[in-house]
Amino acid sequence: IYETSARLLFMAVKWAKNLPSFASLTFRDQVILLEESWAELFLLNAIQWCMPIDTTACTLFSLNEHCNSVNNSGFFKPGQLAQDLRILNDTLCRFKSVMVDPAEFACMKAIVLFRSEARGLKDPVQIENLQDQAQVMLAQHSRTQFPGQIARFGRLLLMLPLLRAVNSHKIESIYFQKTIGNTPMEKVLCDMYKN
């Protein structure tokens, strides 16, 4: 699961890096946007590529030792891991029930990536425009490809906050801590981006 998680995160970073609109931003803005959205991009990739988010027994077994040490530091409360995995699985099921197609996943990733309210951005107006373009593309795609589902665009937008139901620190702890150890996720992302 850890190797798959690393691949999915790498794919998300590579996807963003290959977007011409993303590449046109300053390096600093690119890094800030990746730092702000990596967990959601990872989850969207995991959902799109059918990674079993709730690999219950396997995940709980393999994370048991890690979570016990995390519990001692107060990060996870007893039962919190199971609850977070349940939330992630519910999110996966919700996306699967809507049967999000590849074009919709791409638009949703762009909407998540181009978050103009992220602190420290040099050009938040341009980033907001890019997010608006992604929303327009998603709306047009939904309207043309799913004409009988008039509420589809709204439903897809309303599903995006589900990706933040479990915060990025917990996503990092659940899926990446064993492989990255104490290395800050920001450094991991920067290294992935540069390679």
Show the residue positions of the predicted features.
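Nuclear receptor C-terminal ligand-binding domain
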Residues: 1-195
